[in-house]
Swiss-Prot record:
GO terms for cellular component: 90S preribosome; nucleolus; preribosome, small subunit precursor. SUPFAM superfamilies: ARM repeat. Keywords: Nucleus, Repeat, Ribosome biogenesis, rRNA processing. Residues 20-40, 673-685, 691-700 have a biased composition (Basic and acidic residues). Belongs to the NOP9 family. Residues 1-19, 701-730 have a biased composition (Basic residues). It holds the Pfam family PUF_NOP9. This is Nucleolar protein 9. RNA-binding nucleolar protein required for pre-rRNA processing. Involved in production of 18S rRNA and assembly of small ribosomal subunit. Residues 1-56, 656-743 are annotated as: Disordered. It is found in: Nucleus, Nucleolus.
Length: 743
């Protein structure tokens, strides 16, 4: 029998109704296209009684009571603050929250205010707790992955459980698990994580074709594919595919240590590889050329299609050769490839030509270029990309696909491409295609195309300006600052991207013999205010200066001049978000050396300025980082030890920097090798090994040598003093002879 409606109950229902109406109006105002989070009286989410394509119905899991909602909200705050007296008390608190959440997992996951708590609990959960959550979600995954908040909980659960699968491959023992915490009657054998993932896939099977384009489920599906494939989950490319840019980052203290098992490449069972292959087949089964083109241009479908294509090209390469009759996704996109690509009117050629200039579709072309088999890429390059490479690099959209092409070209094809592009380099500079120029310089350096580097460098200088200083000021966007802006926000966003690309180009040039000299001359020619702006504008711009300090120069005064220009602003840079990296980099430059050095007296002056502003430095984490790296406390209390430490740093850097290696050491290393033919290769390896494996031994050896020299010097001084005393006591005749000899 239902309880009679009381006055208090009626008031509570009225409050809930008002909250629902407020949430609906807020959501409608914020974004009309967003699905509503509130519930209607019929038990389904408002406006979502059925799927958009008419398949299936949305489930409603109920709402938490006000007291429960308040408890979980408070628990979320406590976890975020992490102010527990000890780890034991924190573990007890987590256990209590899990007990309170029992049988409420679905409500928590689909709650706007409590889904964050569920994500944090998943990040800190044990293997048994993850498996309980899989069982709690079982049978409802199709609805959960399409829910605005629950989909994030599913993603977190899949990501954090990936490492458990790999761990269980080495040997899984199914312990008896009390899933309900109700005693011996409710105990049952613990399921393997592999089986739980496969059961989840069984629920989603049959719905994959429309989940690909779902606003929330598409992200969850990508996460599931990455877990099944065994790919690293922390890669930047993987993160871009998995998460929306707008997604809130939910983190909790202790999650990184718990997530250690999920990092890097993971071994996966054969069933996962088969499941990933089946998802690829089922997702695009029955799609014709038109459907694939629509999917390739879809904002949600394109990233999923990218991942499907990449996995299709990388998984089971050997099996694809044996099963050539089966149409893969690659040949669905490019029918008849590679032969059909020679015909400009073929379906495959039209697909490439239509997608490469599309803002969304071009991303699929990038994936295709990167992972296509050699025969297909060769046909693409010879028939489509190489003949039109000059036009592709000039376009804002197709230039990204052109960069992927340049990264795969052989030396001969690269030289041919550079010959086409070289006359338009000044135009590329004007259009701010700095990322294209960076790729050209890097690939020419990697392929040993030195003549092409000279041509590109000449065109770059023509495009930037006549004076040496123009190279840095133009590429970093410090010219024409007074130009009026129409859309301030959009322009500032675009300008930041252009500035980053320009700074990355300068950083790349500093590692290439030839262009490095031009960048160093430009840095010497700019005003000190420009150097300060480089140090404080962004991470890419300050990286230009830190890389310049780490790079040897034929000009002995280069590093000294840069530091001298920055000296009046040292304390300001030390407390700046980006500038403190530069101050830390100065400490690593040796005090002596022909190619790279900052005099010791200049380092003392820097430390003195930092000491004057010690209180200011200690007020910020950037300043504390600088004070710690420069050993400010040692400088205050033990000045002599600080000087010894700084000289030790110099000696350590001198012996471990390959680019500054002393000629004597190189000759000795070469003499120790048995064969002259192997000298250059082995010599390089020895220098790298010295950096990685033997710094401590060298440091001990240098200390011992210094100690021996000091002892010898002291003995010699004592001997000289003794001789002088003996001479004074000697006969007058001998003293006269000594005086005559001195005259």
């Amino acid at each position: 029998m239902p309880k009679p409606r009381t006055k208090r109950g009626h008031g509570r229902e009225e409050k809930k109704r008002k909250r629902r109406e407020e949430a609906e109006s807020y959501e409608a105002h914020e974004n009309d296209s967003k699905r509503q989070r509130t519930t209607d009286e019929n038990g389904y989410q408002d406006g979502q009684e059925a799927q958009e394509n008419g398949i299936g119905e949305k489930e409603f899991f109920g709402m938490l009571a006000d007291e429960e909602q308040e408890y979980f909200r408070r628990a979320d705050e406590l976890l975020e603050l992490n102010q527990f007296p000890s780890d034991e008390e924190r573990d007890v608190f987590l256990e209590n929250v899990w007990k309170e959440a029992e049988n409420k997992e679905l409500k928590l996951a689909s709650s706007q205010s409590c889904s964050r708590l569920m994500e944090r609990l998943i990040q800190l959960s044990t293997t048994a707790q993850k498996k309980r959550l899989f069982e709690a979600f079982a049978g409802h995954f199709l609805s959960l992955v399409q829910h605005r908040f629950a989909s994030h909980c599913c993603e977190a659960l899949f990501l954090r459980s990936a490492g458990v699968v790999t761990k269980e491959l080495s040997g899984f023992v199914g312990f008896v698990l009390d899933t309900k915490g109700a005693g011996g009657d409710a105990e049952k054998p613990e399921a393997a994580m592999e089986h739980l993932f496969l059961a989840t896939l069984d629920e989603l099977e049959g719905s994959l074709s429309y989940l690909i384009t779902d606003r929330f489920a598409s992200h969850t599906l990508r996460v599931l594919l990455l877990v099944l494939s065994g790919r690293p989950l922390e890669d930047s490319s993987s993160r871009t595919l998995m998460k929306s840019k707008k997604k809130e980052k939910i983190s909790v203290s202790g999650a990184e240590a718990a997530d250690e098992a999920n990092k890097g490449l993971r071994a996966v069972p054969p069933s996962f590889t088969m499941a990933a292959t089946k998802i690829i087949q089922d997702s695009t089964a029955g799609m014709d050329a038109t459907s694939l083109r629509v999917l390739a241009r879809h904002p949600m479908g394109n990233p999923t299609l990218q991942l499907l294509l990449e996995l299709d090209l990388t998984l089971n390469k050997g099996e694809q050769k044996a099963d050539a009759e089966r149409p893969t996704l690659l040949f669905q996109l490019l029918p008849g490839a590679p032969k059909s690509l020679s015909d400009g009117s073929s379906e495959a050629s039209e697909f490439i030509n239509g997608m490469i200039y599309d803002q969304i579709g071009s991303r699929l072309i990038e994936t295709l270029i990167t992972h296509a088999p050699g025969k297909v890429f060769k046909a693409l390059n010879q028939n489509i990309f190489l003949p039109r490479i000059e036009g592709y690099v000039r376009n804002d959209v197709s230039s990204y696909a052109a960069i992927r092409v340049l990264n795969r070209l052989s030396k001969d094809d690269l030289v041919q491409a550079v010959e086409q592009i070289t006359p338009t380099v000044p135009q590329l500079v004007t259009k701010s295609r700095f990322n294209v120029l960076k790729t050209l310089f890097e690939r020419c350096a990697a392929r040993g195309a030195n003549d092409e580097i000279k041509k590109l460098n000449k065109g770059l200088k023509e495009g930037c300006g006549k004076t040496p200083a123009d190279l840095v000021t133009y590429l970093c966007g410090f010219k024409d600052e007074e130009k009026k802006k129409k859309d301030v926000q959009q322009l500032s966003k675009n300008e930041y991207a252009i500035q980053s690309h320009g700074a990355q180009l300068l950083t790349a040039l500093l590692s290439i013999p030839g262009p490095v000299k031009g960048v160093q001359e430009s840095l010497l020619a700019v005003e000190p205010t420009v150097l300060v702006r480089l140090a404080t504008t962004s991470m890419p711009t300050v990286t230009v200066l830190t890389t310049a300090l780490a790079t040897p120069s034929s000009n002995p005064a280069f590093h000294k001049s840069i530091v001298s220009s920055l000296l009046p602003h040292i304390h300001e840079l030390a407390v700046q978000q980006f500038g403190h990296n530069l101050i830390n980099a100065i400490a690593e430059v040796p005090s002596k050396g022909k190619e790279r050095s900052v005099p010791f007296h200049m380092k003392e002056a820097i430390m003195a300025r930092l000491g004057e502003h010690e209180a200011e430095l200690r007020d910020s984490w950037m300043g504390r980082s600088v004070w710690r790296n420069w050993k400010g406390d040692m400088w205050k209390t033990r000045r002599r030890d600080w000087k010894v430490w700084m000289r030790e740093v110099d000696a350590h850097i001198e012996s471990t920097l390959p680019q500054r290696g002393r000629a004597a050491e190189k000759q000795q290393a070469a003499q120790d090798k048995p064969s002259k033919k192997e000298e250059p290769v082995v010599e390089d390896k020895m220098e790298v090994d010295e950096v990685v494996e033997k710094p401590e031994e060298e440091k001990k050896k240098e200390k011992k040598d210094k100690k021996d020299k000091k002892e010898k010097r002291e003995k010699k001084e004592k001997k000289d003093k003794k001789e002088k005393k003996e001479k004074k006591k000697s006969k007058p005749e001998e003293a006269e002879v000594v005086a005559e000899d001195e005259e």
